[in-house]
Regions:
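Helix-turn-helix DNA-binding segment
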Residues: 1-34
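Short, contiguous strand/loop micro-motifs
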Residues: 28, 43-44
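Residues within the DNA-recognition helix of helix-turn-helix
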Residues: 9, 40-43
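Helix-turn-helix DNA-binding elements, focusing on the entry/boundary residues of the two helices
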Residues: 23, 41, 53
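Basic, Lys/Arg-enriched C-terminal extension of HTH/homeodomain DNA-binding domains
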Residues: 45-68
Length: 68
């Protein structure tokens, strides 16, 4: 699925996930609560059809959101 379905904030969080940051570290970096990050991650998983963090990273690479 194309990543246009992700909001700007969801894309920011996906990039941070690919950098290996924990939800708390993402929250601290973006000045939002961990619970908000949890919700965004759940939304990202649902929108992309991914099942876990590893598949999110693969999705991000395949869709040009991050480069290796």
């Amino acid at each position: 699925m194309p990543d246009e379905q992700l909001s700007v904030r969801e894309r920011e969080i996906l990039v941070a996930v690919c950098r290996g940051l924990s939800n708390q570290e993402i929250a601290d970096e973006l000045f939002i609560s961990k619970r908000t990050v949890d919700k965004h991650r759940a939304n990202i998983l649902e929108k992309t059809g991914c099942k876990n963090t590893a598949s999110l990273v693969v999705y991000a690479i395949r869709n040009g959101i991050v480069e290796i």
